[in-house]
Amino acid sequence: MAEDGPQKQQLEMPLVLDQDLTQQMRLRVESLKQRGEKKQDGEKLIRPAESVYRLDFIQQQKLQFDHWNVVLDKPGKVTITGTSQNWTPDLTNLMTRQLLDPAAIFWRKEDSDAMDWNEADALEFGERLSDLAKIRKVMYFLITFGEGVEPANLKASVVFNQL
């Protein structure tokens, strides 16, 4: 098949586990339990199967989403939810209204090496990242691990075309 024009240069940006931020959110949950207090109205408390990841936009302008590159090294499922939070967790807690829809869900079945995903939602979410990159240097994600996988089993990145 003939090429439609010059090949676009691609830029792959990894989602990186933010261990400090994840730990800080876990300490918030523990602190509330120890003091017998309730969360703020609308606050999102991190669950044991969730971790915070970040994407540092190496380049902010002229990016067009191409695809997600998500690999699980064993069967299981991950849900990647973006946040509108510009994080200063020592000053502000994550609120449920800051979780972006739709989430991207990726899974690997027991009898397969191939990854499956909710294609329409993952594509829509990815396209939003191109817009968010224009106004952000960092994007935070809440990743929920299910069906026996954990952060050590995940490699995830977003691939953009450079315009």
From Swiss-Prot:
Location, primary (coarse class): cytoplasm
Biological process terms in GO annotation: neurogenesis; sensory perception of smell; signal transduction
SUPFAM superfamilies recorded: Olfactory marker protein
Annotated localization: Cytoplasm
A single cellular component GO annotation: cytoplasm
UniProt family annotation: Belongs to the olfactory marker protein family.
Subunit annotation: Interacts with BEX1 and BEX2.
Cited function: May act as a modulator of the olfactory signal-transduction cascade.
Name of the protein described by the UniProt record: Olfactory marker protein
